From Swiss-Prot:
This is Ribonuclease HII. Endonuclease that specifically degrades the RNA of RNA-DNA hybrids. Pfam families: RNase_HII (PF01351). A divalent metal cation binds at residues 22-23, 118. One of its GO terms (cellular component) is cytoplasm. PANTHER family: RIBONUCLEASE H2 SUBUNIT A (PTHR10954), RIBONUCLEASE HII (PTHR10954:SF18). The keyword Nuclease applies. Its cofactor is Mn(2+); Mg(2+). It is an enzyme of class 3 (hydrolase). Its EC number is 3.1.26.4. It comes from the Bacteria. InterPro entries: RNase_HII, RNase_HII/HIII, RNase_HII/HIII_dom, RNaseH-like_sf, RNaseH_sf. One of its GO terms (biological process) is DNA replication, removal of RNA primer. The gene is rnhB.
Length: 205
């Protein structure tokens, strides 16, 4: 009887309990928008929480980098997707964000039965059950994990792009519209990776 209970407990702990998805870079003025989806069992949710997984915005860059390989190792599956600057400018940021999420989901080996999405907006192209959770990255380990993976993936790309776009301090602002970044655009001009649709609002394009 005891063995049966232990077996049932192990099965419960190893069963997929959460599939969370989040985006990063939606509000940036430079570079693509990234999304990540992470599939977790009950057991590995607990382990990741013990390792310090939480809302990526509350973690240092060093801690996020430390956690990514742990998340990828402990996830049952994961996917990363992105949408280009051209897609953002042509389709609008909402559609482009949805597209990056769908691309991340297509990387999964199996379609999840339920998806937990960070934020209030429905993922319209998704044909399946979804729950939208405001501030989900502070409430669900799967969303927090997805947020960290997406954030580090995008930040790594920004560091690589710094070599080609050295006049904009991309390594520092990560493509976001800081006062310093906007000042450098006025000085050096708009590049092919700046979001023209965003810069029009600032009268910079």
């Amino acid at each position: 009887m005891q063995e049966k209970k232990e077996e049932d407990l192990q099965q419960a702990l190893n069963k997929v309990s959460e599939v969370g998805i989040d985006e990063v870079g939606r509000g940036a003025i430079f570079g693509p928008v990234f999304s990540a989806v992470v599939v977790l069992t009950e057991k590995n949710k607990f382990l990741l929480k013990q390792l310090g997984v939480k809302d990526s915005k509350k973690l240092t860059p060093k801690k996020r980098k430390f956690l990514v390989p742990k998340i990828l190792l402990l996830s049952s599956d994961y996917g990363i997707g992105q949408s280009s600057v051209r897609e953002i400018d042509n389709l609008g940021i909402r559609v482009a964000t949805e597209l990056s999420m769908i691309r991340a989901l297509k990387k999964l080996k199996e379609k999840p039965s339920e998806l937990i999405v960070d934020g209030p907006l429905l993922l319209r192209p998704w044909r399946g059950t979804q729950k939208n959770i405001v501030s989900g990255d502070s409430k669900f380990i799967s969303i927090a994990s997805a947020s960290i993976v997406a954030k580090v993936s995008r930040d790594n790309l920004m560091m690589k792009l710094e070599k080609k776009y050295s006049g904009y301090l991309i390594f520092k602002n990560k493509g976001y519209g800081t006062r310093e970044h906007l000042s450098l655009i006025k000085k050096n001009g708009v590049t092919n990776l700046h979001r023209k649709s965003f810069l029009k609002k600032s009268n910079l394009f």
